[in-house]
Amino acid sequence: MTARKSLDRYRRIVIKIGSALLVDRKTGLKKAWLDGMCADIAALKAKGVDVLVVSSGAIALGRSVLDLPSGALKLEESQAAAAVGQISLARAWSESLSHDDIVAGQILLTLGDTEERRRYLNARATINQLLKIGAVPIINENDTVATSEIRYGDNDRLAARVATMTGADLLILLSDIDGLYTAPPHLDPDAKFLETIADITPEIEAMAGGAASELSRGGMRTKIDAGKIATGAGCAMIIASGKTDRPLNAIANGARSSWFAPSGTPVTARKTWIAGQLQPAGELHVDEGAVTALGAGKSLLPAGVRKVTGHFGRGDTIAVIGPSGREIARGLVGYDAEEARQITGRKSAEIEAILGYAGRAAMVHRDDLVMTASVKTKAEKLKKDEAHA
């Protein structure tokens, strides 16, 4: 497992900041806190670290300015609040960063900007150019146009996608939560804090709770989802509290935080994009033999598929689900949904007779597939069993 290191030893860091840290329901923007945050960013940049910020707060700022009532907002109310709040948020970041002669550049992304390959590459090029000229990209979801069906819905996963998109080696999620516990600490007094997470297992996923504040859409569940995206692409992740005046400085000085180790397996840029897709068009449920084959780096053949769900076309991203119900991989499927159902469980040699044309031997070719969960081969399982015998 890769060892944890000091913040200034990382090359590129993405910092996600929750709404509750930036905005007070009664008084609005927390200017003093933001100034401290920007001082931390300036200190990292002075040591040669690229810094990107995924900043929540537009809707929270907008509803404060518009004096909207507490409670859940309708979609159109959220979009109106975002339209007002985005102006205030961008201005606030620009002013605070200017104290250290740093230029801010605002980027508003939609889900399609990271899900569609061409737009993904264009967004990445824009962000990289901002970093090249020494600016700090301030990124948020474009809540003024995003719909409830086509959106990230939280900035934790958006931040993870930005981290993978830009090749960052550390993602920091700052909120009112100081890290991962074995159970929600406000509900379970015996909950234990986890300082280091080597791998996001089903047990780790089960520890996630829900959102605790109406100012924030994300909870521990979305942070774990973000961790799977980031660590799977070789990017470490830290979950820490941002309640202190200088949160990054606090982390550097040993403040409590949970560190998620990056995957030791490097992936290509294309596979990083595939793995980070937030909305797979469908699912291929596979048997244990297919799980073993995929873990050994082989393609997914129709014979190993047991069930097909969803509506998708050839080339769409699908999730591969193992017998336990856990996602183990994602890939670009070689057949549309109807064809995939017809050849499910059949040998590749039978494809032409079933479909009427000689298609690909693989349902998902290994070059178009990336593992999203660790899978042990039979030899590794046997070795582990022998060690415990």
From Swiss-Prot:
PROSITE patterns: GLUTAMATE_5_KINASE, PUA
EC number: 2.7.2.11
Positions annotated to bind ATP: K16, S175, D176
Protein name (database record): Glutamate 5-kinase
Lineage: superkingdom: Bacteria
UniProt-annotated location(s): Cytoplasm
Domain PUA: 281-358
Keyword Transferase: yes
Pathway: Amino-acid biosynthesis; L-proline biosynthesis; L-glutamate 5-semialdehyde from L-glutamate: step 1/2
Similarity comment: family membership: Belongs to the glutamate 5-kinase family.
GO molecular function: ATP binding; glutamate 5-kinase activity; RNA binding
Function summary: Catalyzes the transfer of a phosphate group to glutamate to form L-glutamate 5-phosphate.
Naturally occurring in which organism (per UniProt): Rhizobium rhizogenes (strain K84 / ATCC BAA-868)
Gene encoding the protein: proB
NCBIfam families in alphabetical order: proB (TIGR01027)
Catalytic reaction(s) noted: L-glutamate + ATP = L-glutamyl 5-phosphate + ADP
Entry GO CC: cytosol
UniProt keyword list: Amino-acid biosynthesis, ATP-binding, Cytoplasm, Kinase, Nucleotide-binding, Proline biosynthesis, Transferase
HAMAP family: ProB
